[in-house]
Amino acid sequence: MKLNLITISLATLVAASAFPAHAGPQAHVVCGYHHTLGDDAIMMFGKANQAMWHDFFGNTHTDAVSTYQTLRAQPDTTCDNKADSSAYWAPSMKLPDGEIVNPAYQKTYYQSTNVAQYPLHPFPAGLELLAGDHHGTGPSSAITFLCANGKGYTNKVGEICGLRKAGDAVQFNIGIAFPNCWDGVNLKPTHTHNNAIYADHGKCSADYPVKIPTVNMNIAWVLPQISSLDTSKVELSMDPVMHGETREERWGSLYTAHADFMNGWTEDGAQFMTDLCMNQGLDCGTAVPYAYSKAEENTWVSSEDDKPHASVDTLYVQDDWTNGERTQHPETLTLVKFKIPPLPANMDASLFKYRIRLFGGKTETNGADQIFFYPTSSDWHASSVSWNNKPAINYRSDAVLYLNHSHEYRMVDVDKAVRKALAEGKTEISWYIGGDRQGNHYDFMPADSKQSLVLMLTGFKKTPEL
């Protein structure tokens, strides 16, 4: 049996009617269907094969005894972003002709609104959420339906889905928007207590004060075996009547649609999603890292200013190599040092990549140029390094960044250099950021700024959206 969430006020739910068009801060994952079980580790923990039939996405080991700890210990996932080993599940679907069909995939958008006034908090480790009502008899603003050839999302049943295009398949989607205000105490809902409710215009109540990203789960069924689908005749699995170990199956209308979410994001991933992505109003797409580290030290040194700059609010870069005369012109270099996030021991390392994310741009408006990331040692400190005592610089760059005057977030691929450092047993890595060799100026935000300066470890493998 599931907790009835229909009593939660949904009048203020934002963007449930068409969440893929959300224009605010967000990130997303695509997770393929993996398996079907009569299990529900949130509301029927330990009772294998006694729940309704559920289709599972994400973590491939989800069953009746799954927890955050088991998800992270066995993180294999069908999700494209390998920072997300969450478990997602929803009831199985039966077509009007009686065929029980598997979904193709689900795409979840993590979204929010009004983050400037009411910022988000990361998902706590172990958080479990429910959405929808498995006894529902009418429309809910948390549940939406889509025929891929139709007029967009609706919360009413009855549309006839046709082929997406001639000679193709019928596609039917169900969207489920989860509550986004946690009570701050209970990681797990119970039959008598909702551990989360919906925000009111982005604001959480005193009883549920912790604002978290809205989990907008969008499940897609792709059905090439039919040419039309009457959604009023589609059914979803309900809890069976158990006769000992024998199941007597029950089915309900689409209004019984609901879903479960068991957080399995890495703690770094959950933290980055809120603090360095959504709270800054960004759409980060799939660029939420498995792990990351802020620059533990960053500064700049100048040939015209032989002084340390222990505390900086801007990082500067400029050099001029024209006519082969680098040393005859002023030169300003930024120095950055990072702890290296280790590669996961229990996942395919080939799916992962190290990248630097930094915010900044060129001062001049004379077009785009490339700047260079030069390797150096990590035996320096921002409090004491200056031009004349700086570590040696190797002008054979590890990476280049092509950029113009627009000040924005930028990604730099440093994967080869970081893996080499790891192979050498290093736990830290440093670079100089050098200019375009044409005399132009560049500036970037340091690690302790709102935009920060981070070394990211991202893992990704594309999940097909059929």
Which residues make up each language-model segment?
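Gram-negative bacterial Sec-dependent N-terminal signal peptides
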Residues: 1-22
